[in-house]
């Protein structure tokens, strides 16, 4: 049975006469406190916050004056007291509440200013277990939730970014705050404590290796409201969750227009693919369109890798995203800007490269400070009607797999290098995925088809188109290798690769018809390798 409500109407304007300030992040605190004091608001505070306010020459009461109880246990207990929570939770127009406040000498608090111990930052810093636990705030969330619940009478400010709007509202309403304004502050406060608790519960699950906890929460902070989502009739916002994995969420944008929803989605896909390639071994470039690769290549330089990647599908590359695995240099930048590109993302960029990109004022340039580790664990989340699908990140890397040659002919060393390259790329292509590759570059990519053989045929067709556009007399797939993200259920997919001129195949294996597919490969002198790992991507 639910708790019954008394349905006491909330006042519109509530005068702010007393404020309790208890913050860890003291950004803007003194100016805000000074403005409140100038408006005649009595300041009450705790610990380090009270000290900072007093040192600024402002009159402030320590919270212990309200509670009659000192701060104890290394500051763990400061505000967990009826005199504080009664002051925040009391319904002023409820006669019983008002009588209790008078009886116990509880002085009402009209404004709470509170932000929390930096749990998320301490967790990301690699601190030990005890330090992380010590940075779980208890009193702060308790006060925030109390104030937010009682927004009928109390305003709660959790973000220093809101100080100016609070002062403006107080000035506009002659020392009061409106109910609508208090509701908005309360909504933000509950979102903040929910996000905070989500981070804590997520850390515990990770620390205790609980793969699928009974209850799971996901939190994030809004960084921007976008013009629209995937389509103009859809609204969109970008939230970051504090994960420091190098990528679009952690990048610095050096120049260019605001990123769109589709830009962010495609840029994430591009950089995750670039992260598959060790920069100490080779330069690598990935060109992405609609979250699918349209060209990927390795080279001795970013310039050479970009040229090879672009040659795979120059038509689709128009308006695409370019991701690189090394510092963007001037030579590569000069070539990239010749084709209309939406975003370039790189671990870093030289000043010369940045200047070249700056000539294209709308082209976004992002630098991340590093590459995403393809082997690191993580979580992916997809919303479905009424729920969430949660799974571990696909962190299988072909170099770590036990590859099995299943045909009479084994791949040559050059073929094996290309097979591994192609399988890396196939991991990032929407299923059904087929990737043709030669000499460390994709030459044909088939993505997103319901039939694997159709993906194979499309990849071969695109390779033929690219060859014709380049004035070549034979298809790019001649002498190539082919990777499939999942097994060939029948020999037809492999035979399509044979028809395109492929000489070797890499695929997970595991079909009931593996023997037929292997026999077809042997019949045509094709070398085939099984990985034992599938890379479906939807």
From Swiss-Prot:
It catalyses: (6R)-10-formyltetrahydrofolate + 5-amino-1-(5-phospho-beta-D-ribosyl)imidazole-4-carboxamide = 5-formamido-1-(5-phospho-D-ribosyl)imidazole-4-carboxamide + (6S)-5,6,7,8-tetrahydrofolate; IMP + H2O = 5-formamido-1-(5-phospho-D-ribosyl)imidazole-4-carboxamide. GO terms for molecular function: IMP cyclohydrolase activity; phosphoribosylaminoimidazolecarboxamide formyltransferase activity. Residues 8-158 form the MGS-like domain. Keywords: Hydrolase, Multifunctional enzyme, Purine biosynthesis, Transferase. Pathway: Purine metabolism; IMP biosynthesis via de novo pathway; 5-formamido-1-(5-phospho-D-ribosyl)imidazole-4-carboxamide from 5-amino-1-(5-phospho-D-ribosyl)imidazole-4-carboxamide (10-formyl THF route): step 1/1; Purine metabolism; IMP biosynthesis via de novo pathway; IMP from 5-formamido-1-(5-phospho-D-ribosyl)imidazole-4-carboxamide: step 1/1. GO terms for cellular component: cytosol. PROSITE patterns: MGS. SMART domains: AICARFT_IMPCHas, MGS. The keyword Iron does not apply. It holds the Pfam family AICARFT_IMPCHas. GO terms for biological process: 'de novo' IMP biosynthetic process. Its EC number is 2.1.2.3, 3.5.4.10. NCBIfam families: PRK00881.1, purH. Belongs to the PurH family. The IMP cyclohydrolase activity resides in the N-terminal region. This is Bifunctional purine biosynthesis protein PurH. It comes from Mesorhizobium japonicum (strain LMG 29417 / CECT 9101 / MAFF 303099) (Mesorhizobium loti (strain MAFF 303099)). The gene is purH.
């Amino acid at each position: 049975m639910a708790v019954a409500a008394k349905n006491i109407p909330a006042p519109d304007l509530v005068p702010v006469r007393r404020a309790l300030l208890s913050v860890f992040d003291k950004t803007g605190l003194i100016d805000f406190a000074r403005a409140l004091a100038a408006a005649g608001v009595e300041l009450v505070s705790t610990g380090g916050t009270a000290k900072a306010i007093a040192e600024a020459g402002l009159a402030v009461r320590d919270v212990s004056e309200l509670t009659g109880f000192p701060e104890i246990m290394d500051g763990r207990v400061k505000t967990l007291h009826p005199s504080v929570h009664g002051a925040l939770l009391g319904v002023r127009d409820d006669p019983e509440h008002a009588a209790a406040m008078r009886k116990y000498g509880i002085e009402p608090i009209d404004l709470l200013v509170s932000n929390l111990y930096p749990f998320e930052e301490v967790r990301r810093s690699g601190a030990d277990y005890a330090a992380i636990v010590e940075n779980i705030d208890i009193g702060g969330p308790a006060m925030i939730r109390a104030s937010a619940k009682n927004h009928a009478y109390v305003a709660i400010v959790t973000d220093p970014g809101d100080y100016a709007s609070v002062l403006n509202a107080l000035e506009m309403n002659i020392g009061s705050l409106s109910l609508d304004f208090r509701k908005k502050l309360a909504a933000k406060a509950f979102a903040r404590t929910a996000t905070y608790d989500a981070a804590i519960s997520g850390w515990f699950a990770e620390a205790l290796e609980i793969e699928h906890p009974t209850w799971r929460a996901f939190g994030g902070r809004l960084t921007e409201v976008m013009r629209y989502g995937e389509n103009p009739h859809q609204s969109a916002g970008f939230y970051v969750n504090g994960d420091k994995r190098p990528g679009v969420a952690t990048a610095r944008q050096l120049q260019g227009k605001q990123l769109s929803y589709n830009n962010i989605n495609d840029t994430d896909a591009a950089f995750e693919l670039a992260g598959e390639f060790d920069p100490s071994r080779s330069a690598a470039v990935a060109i992405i369109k609609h979250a699918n690769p349209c060209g990927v290549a390795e080279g001795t330089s970013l310039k050479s890798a970009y040229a090879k990647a672009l040659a795979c599908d120059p038509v689709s590359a128009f308006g695409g995203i370019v991701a690189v695995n090394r510092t963007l240099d001037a030579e590569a930048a000069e070539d990239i800007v010749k084709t209309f590109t939406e975003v370039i993302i790189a671990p870093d960029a030289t000043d010369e490269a940045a200047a070249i990109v700056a000539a294209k004022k709308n082209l976004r340039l992002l630098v991340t400070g590093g590459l995403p580790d393809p082997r690191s664990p993580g979580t992916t989340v997809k919303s479905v009607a009424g729920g969430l699908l949660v799974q571990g990140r696909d962190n299988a890397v072909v170099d770590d797999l036990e590859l099995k040659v299943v045909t009479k002919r084994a791949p040559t060393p050059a073929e094996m290098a290309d097979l591994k390259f192609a399988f890396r790329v196939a991991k990032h292509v929407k299923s059904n995925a087929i990737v043709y590759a030669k000499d460390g570059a994709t030459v044909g990519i088939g993505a997103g088809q319901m039939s694997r053989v159709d993906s194979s045929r499309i990849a071969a067709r695109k390779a033929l188109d690219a060859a014709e556009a380049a004035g070549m007399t034979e298809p790019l797939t001649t002498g190539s290798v082919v990777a499939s993200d999942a097994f060939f259920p029948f020999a037809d997919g492999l035979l399509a690769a044979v028809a395109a001129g492929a000489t070797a195949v890499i695929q997970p294996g595991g079909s009931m018809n593996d023997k037929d597919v292997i026999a077809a490969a042997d019949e045509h002198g094709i070398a085939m390798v099984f990985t034992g790992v599938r890379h479906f991507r939807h």
